[in-house]
């Protein structure tokens, strides 16, 4: 019978949103609030605009894995306050 009551401390509202941190190589951290089923390209574009970067210049990774523009936080099993890492695209390599 006790199981019928909602558990205290469990968020029931805002469960479709997630707070994510985007960490740049320069140590900067930008926070975003995004829906769990929204493609991450929306966050990626917003980050680029805010930082004055081009999507072609940088790569986004979560837990060391590349993020595709069509991926969603739900697909990647992201949790609240998770961090996405941003890396500058490396070009060339020979002199």
Swiss-Prot record:
Record propeptide residues: 94-95
UniProt PTM: Polymeric chains can be formed through Lys-11 cross-linking.
Record-given protein name: Small ubiquitin-related modifier 2-B
InterPro entries assigned: Rad60/SUMO-like_dom (IPR022617), Ubiquitin-like_dom (IPR000626), Ubiquitin-like_domsf (IPR029071)
Residues in Ubiquitin-like domain copies: 16-95
PROSITE patterns to which the protein is assigned, alphabetical: UBIQUITIN_2
Cross-link Glycyl lysine isopeptide (Lys-Gly) (interchain with G-Cter in SUMO): where in chain: 11
A single Gene Ontology CC term: nucleus
Principal location: nucleus
Crosslink position(s): Glycyl lysine isopeptide (Gly-Lys) (interchain with K-? in acceptor proteins): 93
Superkingdom of the organism of origin: Eukaryota
Organism encoding this protein: Xenopus laevis (African clawed frog)
Key words of the record: Isopeptide bond, Nucleus, Ubl conjugation, Ubl conjugation pathway
Subcellular location: Nucleus
């Amino acid at each position: 019978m006790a199981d019928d009551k909602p558990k205290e401390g469990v968020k029931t509202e805002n469960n479709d949103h997630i707070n994510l941190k985007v960490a740049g190589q320069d140590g900067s951290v930008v926070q975003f609030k995004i829906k769990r089923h929204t493609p991450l390209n929306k966050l990626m574009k917003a980050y680029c605009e805010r930082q004055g970067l081009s999507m072609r210049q940088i790569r986004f990774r979560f837990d060391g894995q590349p993020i595709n523009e069509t991926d969603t936080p739900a697909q990647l099993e992201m949790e609240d306050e998770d961090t996405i890492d941003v890396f500058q695209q490396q070009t060339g390599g020979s002199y």
